[in-house]
């Protein structure tokens, strides 16, 4: 390198070091226009110094498109630091949008069960765990499989489902929530929508799935346009910690019922409430009383032990159970059920302190509990409900029942079939009903007999199948979609 070149190199090195602090100082004293002129002069000087000071490689293609360079030049009149000098342009590199293969992988993982299997019916459910609604899912899926309907069950939550093994062997299961657990909610919705649109199934049944209800609300019209018949099951409203009504029927149904081909429930009372408060057409509504266990048998009862079998959660009012047990020290209360996290503190400790209460944890089969033969009756204390399956199982086992008049319970339990107390009954009223049931064995036996007759007549498998076939378009060989079947709207007899 010549002497002139070496001098220019030293000057360029000095300029690189001194330029930032000088520019910072000048920003405090110069106007924007003066500062802009200084930067332009420095850029020209830098180009002259570096021309011989460094070996410039052959120019490479510009990473930035020309229109961006032009905009930077225009913006430099306002902010001189944005001027697209050669040095500034060299720091830019090519950029490509990141590719997220997650949705594509989820879609590909579900293709076999949605497309290749070619199901006739798709069930969208949150999980299959121990519970009445989950048992209802099993009833619906079993009925479809029994009638030759090809079924795909889509589990939309990322949770363990211990009851998956109860599904018929020929049913396909997609654990959608677990497969897509790394995706965002919108990606999961869009992948599921694409699968449902491309799936040959004409019927879709939503049962308690948050993701499915969101999909119905946002894309129900699209699914309808593609010829999908969408059915949804609702059982009761929920109540939050402030006793405010919530749940799928409150949050989604008023905005999405128009996309449904049918609204199903296990009780008639709740459907009437929805019709009265939201104005949903009664011809859209269908109630199907769930069947009792196929292996139901009456089991002789003895003693004075009271069975309480429910999930220990705020809905089931374990605090009320505590007050009832406190008021009836002469009776033993055996409590079976998984403890909700909300009740693992003081509520659980209070129950353990009572000498006439025994906590046994969760159970898998009510019939297995009843076969022990040591229970005199079932106590049910739910705050809100549909038509609880446990009442059917207890009746099948020959147990008398004391329960509150909430949800659809009065459709099964009344003064002829059990001991019904008011929805707002306190511990004293429950205690009086329990004493009446256990203190009058002849009358109690008569009511149990009537309850079992009702169970046989209305809650058999054939009755469930016949009711499902009356839902327009739901099952092959049933009522055609163009035929109307209206829900009777007179009050339920109690």
Where would I find each of the regions flagged by the language model?
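Conserved acidic donor-binding segment of nucleotide-sugar-dependent glycosyltransferases
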Residues: 415, 419-427, 436-441
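A short, active-site helix/loop in glycosyltransferases that binds the activated sugar's phosphate group
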Residues: 77-82, 215, 243-247, 251-284
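Non-catalytic membrane-proximal stalk/linker segments that position and tether the catalytic domains
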Residues: 20, 24-120, 479-494
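Short hydrophobic beta-strand element within catalytic cores of glycosyltransferases
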Residues: 400-403
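Aromatic "clamp/platform" in nucleotide-sugar-dependent glycosyltransferases that forms part
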Residues: 383
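Nucleotide-activated donor-binding/catalytic signature segment of Leloir-type glycosyltransferases, i.e.
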Residues: 172-176, 345-363
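Glycosyltransferase donor-sugar binding loop
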Residues: 155-160, 332-346, 359-361
């Amino acid at each position: 390198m010549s002497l002139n070149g070496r001098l220019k190199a030293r000057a360029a090195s000095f300029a690189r070091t001194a330029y930032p602090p000088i520019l910072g100082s000048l920003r405090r004293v110069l106007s924007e226009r003066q500062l802009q002129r200084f930067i332009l002069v420095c850029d020209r000087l830098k180009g002259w110094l570096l021309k011989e000071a460094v070996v410039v490689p052959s120019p490479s293609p510009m990473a930035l498109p020309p229109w961006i360079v032009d905009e930077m030049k225009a913006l430099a009149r306002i902010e001189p630091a944005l001027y697209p000098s050669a040095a500034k342009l060299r720091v830019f590199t090519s950029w490509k949008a990141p590719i997220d293969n997650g949705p594509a992988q989820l879609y590909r993982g579900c293709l076999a069960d949605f497309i290749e299997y070619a199901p006739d019916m798709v069930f969208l459910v949150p999980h299959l765990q121990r519970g009445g609604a989950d048992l209802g899912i099993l009833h619906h899926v079993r009925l479809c499989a029994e009638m030759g309907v090809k079924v795909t069950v889509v589990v939309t939550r990322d949770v363990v489902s211990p009851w998956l093994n109860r599904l018929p062997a020929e049913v396909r299961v997609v654990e959608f929530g677990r497969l897509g657990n790394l995706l965002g909610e919108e990606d999961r919705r869009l992948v599921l929508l694409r699968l449902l649109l491309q799936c040959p199934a004409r019927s879709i049944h939503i049962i308690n799935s948050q993701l499915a209800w969101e999909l119905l609300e946002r894309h129900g019209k699209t699914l309808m346009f593609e010829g999908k018949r969408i059915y949804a099951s609702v059982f009761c409203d929920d109540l939050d910690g402030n006793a405010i009504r919530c749940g799928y029927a409150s949050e989604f149904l008023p905005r999405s019922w128009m996309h449904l081909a049918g609204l199903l429930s296990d009780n008639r009372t709740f459907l009437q409430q929805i019709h009265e408060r939201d104005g949903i057409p009664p011809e859209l509504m269908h109630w199907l009383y769930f069947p009792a266990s196929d292996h139901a048998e009456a089991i002789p009862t003895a003693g004075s032990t009271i069975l309480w079998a429910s999930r220990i959660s705020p809905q089931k009012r374990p605090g009320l159970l505590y007050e009832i047990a406190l008021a009836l020290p002469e009776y033993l209360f055996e409590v079976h059920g998984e403890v909700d996290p909300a009740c693992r503190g003081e509520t659980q400790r209070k129950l353990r302190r009572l000498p006439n209460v025994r906590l046994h944890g969760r159970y898998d089969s009510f019939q297995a509990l009843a076969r022990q033969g040591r229970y005199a009756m079932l106590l049910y204390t739910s705050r809100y409900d549909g038509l609880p399956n446990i009442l059917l199982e207890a009746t099948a086992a020959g147990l008398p029942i004391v329960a509150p008049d909430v949800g659809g319970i009065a459709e099964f339990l009344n003064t002829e079939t059990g001991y019904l107390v008011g929805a707002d009954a306190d511990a004293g009223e429950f205690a009086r009903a329990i004493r009446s049931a256990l203190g009058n064995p002849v009358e109690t036996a008569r009511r149990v007999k009537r309850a079992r007759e009702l169970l046989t007549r209305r809650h058999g498998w054939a009755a469930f199948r016949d009711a499902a076939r009356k839902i327009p378009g739901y099952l092959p060989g049933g009522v055609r979609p163009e035929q109307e079947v209206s829900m009777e709207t007179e009050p339920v007899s109690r």
